[in-house]
Amino acid sequence: MRKNGRGELDLRPILLEPRVSKHAEGSCLVRFGDTHVLCTASVDEKVPPHVYGTGAGWVTAEYGMLPRSTHERMQREAARGKQTGRTLEIQRLVGRALRAAVDLRAIGPRTVTLDCDVIQADGGTRTAAITGAYVALVQAVRGIQKRRQLAQDPVKRSVAAVSVGIVAGQVHLDLDYDEDSTAEVDMNVVATGDGALVEVQGTAEGKPFPRAELDRMLDAALAGLSRLKELQEAALRTP
């Protein structure tokens, strides 16, 4: 039995609280247990140079951790003058994941930026960020639709993410920090609501793992992602 009485294939307590920002076109405060991430969506009526002139739009993301989101205070990256490789990797992952949810041409020549700010970290910040950012993205797109600026709905599918790993020889879903730090295998899985894979990041710590364990982890992750899809849908129904 895991913390809080969780079974090996149980998610942490999940909360997706939409519309928490007064100013952003879309927002969601997402909680995966003790990992809390504020996700906001902002719409800008212009596109980056590599998209300009194509008629398509763009979805991108930025990610950051508040100084005291961890056990000891971290220096702000702005104070250091540069982002870490980890930060750049995660925000690119979030952007790729969210672009899988939409038809960029249907968005039109505008950019939606998802800002994911970690308030408190206890493992799985990138997976929580993706799951909450999707809710914020849909709200922002619905706002554009209400202004009658879109001919069709650009959102084609939902996207969510979850971690999974091998801990003490057993598959565990949605790892917290302590589990992640001792896992023999650590994996992040991003998938659409219909179970199509967007991205799989997996690493063995110490020794390789067989294909059978990969399949077991993917099965566990996809089951958890099905539950996350339900929670996203419920959050988006909230008035």
From Swiss-Prot:
Please write the reaction equations for the catalytic activity of this protein. tRNA(n+1) + phosphate = tRNA(n) + a ribonucleoside 5'-diphosphate
For whether the record's keyword set contains tRNA-binding, the answer is yes
Q: What class of enzyme is it?
A: transferase
Molecular function as annotated in GO: 3'-5'-RNA exonuclease activity; tRNA binding; tRNA nucleotidyltransferase activity
List, alphabetically, the SUPFAM superfamilies matched.
Ribonuclease PH domain 2-like (SSF55666), Ribosomal protein S5 domain 2-like (SSF54211)
The UniProt similarity line reads: Belongs to the RNase PH family.
**Annotated protein name in UniProt:** Ribonuclease PH
Tell me the organism. Anaeromyxobacter sp. (strain K)
What gene name does this entry carry? rph
